[in-house]
Amino acid sequence: MVLCSNDTVRQLVHSTPIVAQSFIEEDGSVTLSMSDLDLVVNAENMQEAKQALIDDLTEYAEEYYQNFELYSRAPNRREHLSLVMKVLTSASKKELEDAVQCQNGKI
């Protein structure tokens, strides 16, 4: 077991990207998708979409942490740990929203 402070964990996961595919829908709304996490949100604009994505990502991170024994061993979730730790140790929701990197999605 390794014990370290939130600041140390934050430094370790600082470079972990939060990457989402972005799609502008026909009605002008914005869809953001993190397919590796099965997260998809839609909102009226990019800012609201980022906020919704971070809300869903935070919920997932908390669920991962609560079920750590299971999730950390699951082949489809094991690789999410650094992102989960980034979310859980972030200083603010705004910090996470600013960290979201949107790439043009392709259908």
What are these regions (language model features)?
Residues M1-V19, F23, Q51-I107:
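Short, charged, surface-exposed hinge/linker loops at domain edges
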Residues T16-D36:
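Short aromatic-glycine-(Arg/Gly/Cys) micro-motifs in beta-strand/loop hairpins
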